[in-house]
């Protein structure tokens, strides 16, 4: 989400992205690393200078006989719904045959949610940020990408998702964060959890 937004809408260089050659083959990680130099020192320096996703999220860059690993200053927790959800299982047929020369199509099965208000939180570690040379400009683009990137999701499972609230906390004390922020959020609902379909059905407390 964030990587796609920063690359497609802000023109930022992204290390972890799909690149195809003239024959349509996907570039592997070692070939991608070679775009930034020949030696370990060259690759490390040039990747950090040019690739905002590595400065933000870190990454492991494989080389021919070695690798470079950067721990990402930005870490997110796994999102979870802030209320009970109406989970439905649907079945359908796929677009392809079940095997070569067969007439029957494959079957697919998936789970969908009628609605869910999903909460995430993350941290930016100032010590790791010094190692990846993360800048305030990078952080500003991260925040922009979190908000606008969500609105630009177009995959089948994510289309229609909208951001509802974004709060950034700046700590005065170094090497400190509150943690467990989702436990400090609750919903005041005017319907049962499973009946929630829009922000009209709740307020955030």
Regions found by a protein language model. Give the residues of each.
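RNA-binding basic/glycine-rich loop and surface signature characteristic of RAMP-family CRISPR effectors
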Residues: 1-205
């Amino acid at each position: 989400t964030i990587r796609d937004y920063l690359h497609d809408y802000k023109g930022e260089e992204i290390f972890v992205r799909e690149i195809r050659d003239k024959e349509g083959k996907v570039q592997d990680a070692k070939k991608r690393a070679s775009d930034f130099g020949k030696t370990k020192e060259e690759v490390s320096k040039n990747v950090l200078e040019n690739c905002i996703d590595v400065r933000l999220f870190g990454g492991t860059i494989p080389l021919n006989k070695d690798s470079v690993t950067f721990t990402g200053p930005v870490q997110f927790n796994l999102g979870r719904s802030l209320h009970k959800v109406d989970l439905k299982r649907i079945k359908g047929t796929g677009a392809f045959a079940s095997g070569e020369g067969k007439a029957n199509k494959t079957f697919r099965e998936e789970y969908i949610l009628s609605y869910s208000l999903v909460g995430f939180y993350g941290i930016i570690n100032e010590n790791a940020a010094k190692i990846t040379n993360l800048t305030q400009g990078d952080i500003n683009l991260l925040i922009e990408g979190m908000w606008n990137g969500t609105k630009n999701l177009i995959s089948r499972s994510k289309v229609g998702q909208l951001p509802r609230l974004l709060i950034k906390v700046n700590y005065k004390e170094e090497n400190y964060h509150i943690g467990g922020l989702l436990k400090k959020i609750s919903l005041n609902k005017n319907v049962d959890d499973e009946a929630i379909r829009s922000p009209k059905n709740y307020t955030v407390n």
